[in-house]
Amino acid sequence: MVLEYFAIEIDLRTAGNFVHNITLTNPKEANGAVLYYLAIGDQADDHLRTRLLLVDHLLKEPTFSALRTKEQLGYVVQSMMWYRSSALGFVIRIQSERHPAYVEKRIETFLESYRAEIAGMNIEEFKKQRKGLIDKQRQRLENLNEEASRFWYHIESGYYDFTRRALFLHFQ
């Protein structure tokens, strides 16, 4: 399998829906992929980044459960915060045999339904989820690989604030 990496430059200062289609070089390839990116703001905004970390925590399991397990959209289903340069975003990535337009629609439907679920969450459940995230952030790294991965992620993002984790705990 040959993976191709490419970069697309889009001005995210204006709102919009941007789709970039790529023709596969192998016409027999049944899989497609969707990288659904939501631009959130400037990653230097500590409060915004902290809130997005909570959203990421709230969405991770339901995204996999709904889109991978229940809808069986694809083998690869991931959701995550996304840091690049100064941009802060949220990504849902799905590799699927289904048409990308269909996958995109299912992602949007899921986000709308889960938005309502978060809005209707009672305060006790919200506090429980928040505590779960705080506990997760307080966990010590288990090995050198985890620590290297964390540092490397800061380097790749172009935002060299290696104290983010401690800052998150300050904003709790």
What do these predicted regions represent?
Residues 1-91, 95-172:
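Mature, solvent-exposed C-terminal subdomains and processed small-chain segments of exported/organellar
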